[in-house]
Amino acid sequence: MNYINKVMLVGRCGQEPDLKFFESGAVKASISIAVRPPYRSEQALWFDLVAWGNQAEVIGNYVRKGTQIAITGEFGFDRWADKNSGTMRQKPVITINTIELLGSPRKEESTSTSAPNETQAVANANF
């Protein structure tokens, strides 16, 4: 039996990309996106995304908070040991396979200098 693990999302980036460069030359970008349901009264759904290599470089160069993107990727989990207790932790994450830039940040989002808001806190919450 074959299995399919494919995710397709269109949403707006919720934060500036977090880029990491490794000694091996690998590049990793981490972002979150908000996907708004068709009915405005419903709250947006937040997804944590990671990208490697060329996709990470595209994200670092062109994606900013508020940029609308479309991605395809694979669902998985980041796993790590808690530094204090040694307990294994995990959070859901989507690894990007393809990314398409759909639009620039909205004016009010790109010029905002306010403190982090509730949506940023939700985007960074551990599940």
Swiss-Prot record:
GO terms for molecular function: single-stranded DNA binding. This is Single-stranded DNA-binding protein 2. Residues 111-127 have a biased composition (Polar residues). It comes from Nostoc sp. (strain PCC 7120 / SAG 25.82 / UTEX 2576). Residues 4-103 form the SSB domain. Keywords: DNA-binding, Plasmid. One of its GO terms (biological process) is DNA replication. One of its GO terms (cellular component) is nucleoid. PROSITE patterns: SSB (PS50935). The lineage of its organism: Bacteria, Bacillati, Cyanobacteriota, Cyanophyceae, Nostocales. Transmembrane segments: none annotated. Homotetramer. Residues 104-127 are annotated as: Disordered. InterPro entries: NA-bd_OB-fold, Primosome_PriB/ssb, ssDNA-bd.
